Amino acid sequence: MQRSPLEKASVISKLFFSWTRPILRKGYRQRLELSDIYQIPSADSADNLSEKLEREWDRELASKKNPKLINALRRCFFWRFTFYGIILYLGEVTKAVQPLLLGRIIASYDPDNKVERSIAIYLAVGLCLLFVVRTLLLHPAIFGLHHIGMQMRIAMFSLIYKKTLKLSSRVLDKISIGQLVSLLSNNLNKFDEGLALAHFVWIAPLQVTLLMGLLWDLLQASAFSGLGVLIILACFQAGFGRMMMKYRDQRAGKINERLVITSEMIENIQSVKAYCWEEALEKMIENFRQSELRLTRKAAYVRYFNSSAFFFSGFFVVFLSVLPYALIKGIILRKIFTTISFCIVLRMAVTRQFPWAVQTWYDSLGAINKIQDFLQKQEYKSLEYNLTTTDVVMETVTAFWEERFGELFEKAKQNNNNRKISNVDNSLFFSNFSLLGTPVLKDINFKIERGQLLAVAGSTGAGKTSLLMMIMGELEPSEGKIKHSGRISFCSQFSWIMPGTIKENIIFGVCYDEYRYRSVIKACQLVEDISKFAEKDNTVLGEGGITLSGGQRARISLARAVYKDADLYLLDSPFGYLDVLTEKEIFESCVCKLMANKTRILVTSKMEHLKKADKILILHEGSSYFYGTFSELQNLRPDFSSKLMGYDSFDQFSAERRNSIITETLRRFSLEGDAAHSWNETKKQSFKQTGEFGEKRKNSILNPINSLRRISITQKTPLPMNGIDEDSGETLERRLSLVPDCEQGEGILPRSNLINTGPTLQRGRRQSVLNLMTHSSGNQGQNIHRRTTAFTRKMSLAPQANLVEMDIYSRRLSQDSGLEISEEINEEDLKECFLDDVESIPAVTTWNTYLRYITVHKRLIFVLIWCFVVFLIEVAASLVLLCLLSKVSPEDKGNTTKSANDSSAVIITSTSSFYFLYIYVGVADTFLALGLFRGLPLVHTLITVSKILHHKMLHSVLQAPMSTLNTLKAGGILNRFSKDIAILDDLLPLTIFDFIQLLLIVIGAVAVVSILKPYIFLATVPVIVAFVLLRAYFLHTSQQLKQLESEARSPIFTHLVTSLKGLWTLRAFGRQPYFEALFHKALNLHTANWFLYLSTLRWFQMRIEMIFVIFFIAVTFISILTTGEGEGTVGIILTLAMNIMSTLQWAVNSSIDVDSLMRSVSRVFKFVDIPTEENKPTKSIKLPKDGQLSKVMIIENQHVKKDDIWPSGGQMTVKDLTAKYIDGGNAILENISFSISPGQRVGLLGRTGSGKSTLLSAFLRLLNTKGEIQIDGVSWDSITLQEWRKAFGVIPQKVFIFSGTFRKNLDPYGQWSDQEIWKVADEVGLRSVIEQFPGKLDFVLVDGGYVLSHGHKQLMCLARSVLSKAKILLLDEPSAHLDPITYQIIRRTLKQAFADCTVILCEHRIEAMLECQRFLVIEENKVRQYDSIQRLLSEKSLFRQAISPSDRVKLFPHQNSGKHKSRSKITALKEETEEEVQDTRL
């Protein structure tokens, strides 16, 4: 980043913002890069501002019982805020004085007042000087206030982030990620946007008092009639505002519903295509869109009339102010023109400035109170550790995630009674529901010595992770004692990858040691994976490691934990995503050898791990079921396997599991109603974290945090994002960032939002932060590439071949300090940081975009013609009236008037007061009627255009190939449907209308003035040219700066979400200061862009004012020097001159706004033009032997079942299959060829990242593929894409549950009857689950079905496959993180419901793979082996290495029996006995 010219700029350069000229010049000539942005002033750095505010806040906390954040802010910023307020007031005072001088100039041309003619020149000079002073006062004051607002936002951003890292886990469970993002964006944005208006809360009343005094002097008591009109108008606008709020509140719910489904569709687009649900979801989203648009139109009409009322209120104010005076004393020209000028200023103060100021203070104080409440929440308390101890001891420890569970039950029950919910199933309330808080851990005792391995096992929800959290201090024990040294390293169950390189993720701020680092990556089996990357371990991992496989992410997380030199290592199920062979090698080489001298606590369910552990702790429902050695376990608890793993009846699961379902159901159904939203909560302890539920608790989706294939943050945000205050009465309209404020104008010149809303609505609707941390398999992140400082690398004296056998921790480094990041972020890092965020959109919207937008709907062209014709009528009427009245002799003085309202601003003279009044009323009423209704058709049609574009974009995305969608960010796609569509719905119609109206007003006024004084036309032309050239010059740079600012905004929220997901890891490693410094870097980067944008904007506004001053000087002196007698002509010219230039300035700003908003249209068009999947057959169709074409071809998404349909057997032949993720990319699979017999079961084998899941996607034609696949003799090139995919039943690795009823999730097209659905639900074990909920099949699942466990969701996918009647079933890791109960149900269903189907299984559990007849071994993207299980075991193969001797002994009887009996059917597989289950897995 370059050094800012501001540091060496002179006072004059700072006053006129001339120091921004270099960046403006460069932006006009070429495309700006992040390296072109200037460094921020040191006073604006996040470190300095946060330290200053934190010091004052700490002082406030220490000195008072009720600390106030506003007091801390006052001590930091009050004096500068007051200074700029006084400057702003002086600038506004000049506006009140200008009409007085204008009146004196007009009066000097009165034939009866020739004495003052000599001082007209001096009065004109004074009037021009007032404009100069006003320009020099207002712009620095406004910029200074914006600057202070920016500094306040930065300081509070940092304070909130630091507080977030300190919050206790219990508090984090009560706060959703959407609330935190809302706190940082919607609330803090108010300081940036509104601080410049805050002073008008006292300036406006003073200005009104001054103006009314001057009007009293001018018109006496009749002046108050005009004020009364303004007050009535303000009340009228307030009524309109309430109507808009009403429609917005209703509309917000519709937007939320649409965006929930849209975000779920985008996040699970691969599953949508696999299920062939494109049409069903498109219809569902369009239905929500229709309801939304009805309310959008109503809100737009109200806003339009509200805006029109302001435009045309000038007529009423002037008319009613002058009418009483004119009827009594006649009309005086000087007083007419002076009154007009006074009323313009008065109208702005009463109807705009003061209401805006009040709203600003209301919003700002509300935001400060929310932040204040957040800053006082309970913090994480570090436990006191004994650094000299070497043992880990727990003595009768009991802990609660959340106490008083029964209170939630009683409250929900009372709410249900009050609401008289009749469809609540009484069986939902189990008799054994505890009225006391349920401990997550109770009476836990154990002791492990240094160097021992403790294996922790237990069923799902037994409290294994909670045990680790308690050791780390995240969960405070209510009873008992915990003793250890406090030097902990932690590996989470769900791998967490921070933005940065592979090496940075592993060393994680710890001092670098080459020997230790190489040992760790070798022990964690990362050497081969790292070697495949071009940049090796310097490869930047973005999106939480989205470019890595799940196994690679898990191994990097494990390597991070192992690399740190600690006394205690907590490993929470680190092998969940690893294949059997890799898991075995890592456990032996890393856990058992490399860490042999370290104390380890490993959460596992593998029998092999238990056998090698020094001690075993088995948990059951939070209690210690067993503690001791493995031999003691076998002797004392011979039934531990079946007892803990739940191989008894599925319907008789524990009361604790049932209570989990109840609690979540009550939370969703009773307390939060339709607004309750949450993410998938798959851990039992998350059900216990209920928190304090307010009846009006609203939740949100992340906006706009950009992501590559997963959604942040950002932005999905189906619900309005409120602050942390649960009981906030803030309206939905104010909270929902997707719905732009009618007056704020998101994305246009004066304002800026700090989050891509809508989406913005990035993810986390009501999921607590705690659940976010425990379900972070889809971590988000930006490609922030940070350079690390050089560290001293110690040379290893040991042979490299024996690295893993050395004790890598015996040579402790001199320091374990965090990684230094004190150097500046260099240009290369900045480019890489935003590589994925840069949009390929021109700096200025092209004419082609405007032309295409106009032609989207043919009616729009006719509407534009209508608007132009109406305007011509107005201008023609003004000119005709002017010509008629110009014949009236000016001798009839004393009766002068104004003939048009503010829209035409034409002033005429008449011969009598009554004649004047008739003309004035008649013409103004005509213009008023035309003006009020000429814009309605335009607004209506533009909303229709938005509807058409949304439909086209939705269809394009749903029909786009995955190869294209893989290159797009999910957050970017969601922003198109949220933020950009909101702009097309709300801002663009009225902004376009305002621009057209203002432009036509200027043209009309110039035409009128040119007729009166042709000389002025000569001055007008160069001024208009100057405006156009200045606009073009500024626009090139401003739009690029705006885009860079938007790109720099994303890392702030991405870093917040990333930090929250890895918060337990951060605390365990003590890296909070490191991440605070990174957060400040992201803030400083955004500040550099935003500060430069504000400065260049003020440069542009000031130049516009300067051109206006020059023009007004020219017009003033031309009119004075060339006009003889006649005060009317001078009044017309000077008044119109002021009106032309203020209107032209407004029109130029509106044109910039339109160009900025049209960028959203460009982005939408970009998605509309996405290529679609090739759905038509590319070959002639091969008819079946019976010659019936209907058996091969059916219409897509046919809702009528057909019994006799292809495929019939499930035979599958693959020939030379090659697959790529994107066009032109590397081949992921090469020359795959094999065949599968009907009803056969095939297992896919290979290391993590070898391409097993990719092969399943290739079967579904979700990738770019070459080669051929045939099913029952029918090639995939001879039938439609939809029909091909319908041949497969799919259970994906990532479960997809969209927001809707159970029935819709199982049967979105409505093909099956309730009896058939219940039958299938019974087969897969879902019936007992569905019957627990009110409404049963009609119960609405939200937020990915958070009330269901992960196993229940897998059963939903299984039920879909059964209903689809598919002959080929694809299963991708169906048992990953699956509880044993559900796993056994899936195995049973596969053997029964799919007995005659072909099954292709990708699985890491050995017992599931043993049931396959053949195995396909994939290695290095190619098929290495494809053979029977006997052949694979008889030779050296990957499968043989993965199978333990005990498994082989069990397997050979199956093989022997297979020689005598056909095993082509799954039902022929031998059922495993309970003993076999016990020996295989916990």
From Swiss-Prot:
EC top class named in words: isomerase
Record's compositionally biased regions (Acidic residues): 1472-1482
Spans annotated as Disordered R region: 654-832
Post-translational modifications reported in the UniProt record: N-glycosylated. Phosphorylated; cAMP treatment promotes phosphorylation and activates the channel. Dephosphorylation decreases the ATPase activity (in vitro). Phosphorylation at PKA sites activates the channel. Phosphorylation at PKC sites enhances the response to phosphorylation by PKA. Phosphorylated by AMPK; this inhibits channel activity.
Record gene name: CFTR
Catalytic activity: ATP + H2O + closed Cl(-) channel = ADP + phosphate + open Cl(-) channel; chloride(in) = chloride(out); hydrogencarbonate(in) = hydrogencarbonate(out); ATP + H2O = ADP + phosphate + H(+)
Similarity section: Belongs to the ABC transporter superfamily. ABCC family. CFTR transporter (TC 3.A.1.202) subfamily.
Region (Disordered): 1450-1482
Intracellular or extracellular location(s): Apical cell membrane; Early endosome membrane; Cell membrane; Recycling endosome membrane
Residues recorded as bearing Phosphoserine in the entry: 549, 660, 670, 686, 700, 712, 737, 768, 796, 814, 1446
Name the record gives this protein: Cystic fibrosis transmembrane conductance regulator
Record: residues binding ATP 1: 401, 434, 458-465, 493
Record's comment describing the protein's domains: Binds and hydrolyzes ATP via the two cytoplasmic ABC transporter nucleotide-binding domains. The two ATP-binding domains interact with each other, forming a head-to-tail dimer. Normal ATPase activity requires interaction between the two domains. The first ABC transporter nucleotide-binding domain has no ATPase activity by itself.
Domain of life per record: Eukaryota
Covalent lipidation (S-palmitoyl cysteine), chain numbering: 524, 1397
Cytoplasmic membrane side: 1-77, 147-195, 244-298, 359-859, 941-991, 1036-1096, 1153-1482
Listed InterPro entries: AAA+_ATPase, ABC1_TM_dom, ABC1_TM_sf, ABC_transporter-like_ATP-bd, ABC_transporter-like_CS, ABC_transporter_C-like, CFTR/ABCC7, CFTR1_ATP-bd_dom1
Function: Epithelial ion channel that plays an important role in the regulation of epithelial ion and water transport and fluid homeostasis. Mediates the transport of chloride ions across the cell membrane. Possesses an intrinsic ATPase activity and utilizes ATP to gate its channel; the passive flow of anions through the channel is gated by cycles of ATP binding and hydrolysis by the ATP-binding domains. The ion channel is also permeable to HCO(3)(-); selectivity depends on the extracellular chloride concentration.
